């Protein structure tokens, strides 16, 4: 499963993140968008592990409260639904 995720992350574009965020009512400014893109590209393994709190702390410092809350909600939702696959 991790190879499949890695291949997806390798192909992920900043526009993919922008479209996904808008679809989920998350309005990111360019700085936030770049930060999330770089975080996903560089730290996706940590996000998929049980040691993801460090990454969430970084997000909290670099996103608006509203965007952070929405992203954390989605993160936990998908972690709960699909975490068993990892």
Regions found by a protein language model. Give the residues of each.
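Amphipathic alpha-helical segments that form the core helices of the histone-fold
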Residues: 34-45, 57
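A ubiquitous short alpha-helical element
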Residues: 1-8, 40-44
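N-terminal acidic leader/helix
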Residues: 5-35
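Long, compositionally biased
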Residues: 49-80
């Amino acid at each position: 499963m991790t190879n499949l995720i890695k291949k997806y992350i390798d192909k992920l574009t900043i526009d993919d993140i922008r479209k996904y965020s808008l679809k989920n009512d998350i309005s990111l400014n360019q700085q936030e968008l770049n930060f999330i893109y770089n975080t996903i590209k560089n730290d996706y393994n940590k996000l998929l592990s049980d040691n993801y709190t460090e990454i969430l702390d970084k997000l909290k410092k670099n996103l608006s409260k509203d965007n952070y809350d929405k992203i954390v909600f989605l993160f936990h939702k998908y972690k709960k639904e699909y975490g068993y696959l990892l």
